[in-house]
Regions:
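Catalytic NTP-binding/metal-coordinating core of nucleotidyl cyclase/transferase enzymes
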Residues: 1-78
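Catalytic beta-strand-to-alpha-helix segment of the class III nucleotidyl cyclase homology domain
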Residues: 40, 59-129
Length: 129
């Protein structure tokens, strides 16, 4: 069983169910565009690896916590800037948690407490980057 210490970023969309209920195809298209045009390149710039995607979220592994936090801050600032002029009820906003922890590697996936913590931290109040 392979173990390693890694920095983990977990993110999900605030109000995803509401956004999907209001405009399913528009939300999916907007989120896919945001990921491909902005978020995925930011992850790459910070040497991140997308471990898994969910409908409204992602789990990303980084070689250092500095990279993970820098990526999170840049994503939050960029998303905020991209939301200017978008009606509040149609904005795509993210909750992001970052942790450093020991993980178990299974294929391309990572498991363990190191992965669980950032998901719990996303529930805390958002900080403005």
């Amino acid at each position: 069983m392979e173990r390693r210490l890694t920095a983990i970023l977990a993110a999900d969309v605030v109000g995803y169910s509401r956004l999907m209920g209001a405009n399913e195809s528009g939300t999916v298209t907007a989120l896919e565009t945001l990921r491909s045009d902005f978020i995925n390149p930011k992850i790459g710039e910070h040497q991140g690896r997308i471990v898994k995607l969910t409908g409204d979220g992602m789990l990303v592994e980084f070689p250092s916590v500095v990279n993970a936090v820098a990526c999170a801050a840049e994503v939050q600032r960029g998303v905020r800037d991209r939301n200017k002029g978008v009606p509040p009820d149609r904005r795509i906003e993210f909750r992001i948690g970052v942790n450093v922890g020991d993980v178990i590697v299974q294929g391309g996936d990572i498991l363990g407490d190191g992965v669980t913590w950032p998901r719990a931290w996303k529930a805390l109040p958002r900080l403005v980057a």
